[in-house]
Amino acid sequence: MFNGIIYQQGTVSKFLKLNAGTKIFIKSKLKLDKKDIGSSIACDGVCLTLVSKRKNLLEFYLSKESINKSKFKYLKIGQKINLELP
């Protein structure tokens, strides 16, 4: 359960469009390990599953439905995004 406390802001660094959705890459200094892959992180209020983490780069997958129903369709490279842990 998310508690509404924003732990940090990340920066949108890359989008990778796929047939069924989009991968989004966010630069962040959140202290996460490989064991956290599969965990949920709220990104600007949208609960996303962490797909991969490399150094300070977090990777998430967004389905087309998630993009269309959220503000993620308006995100731009370099934009700040709030990150919240459960």
Model-derived segments and spans:
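Conserved loop->alpha-helix
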Residues: 1-86
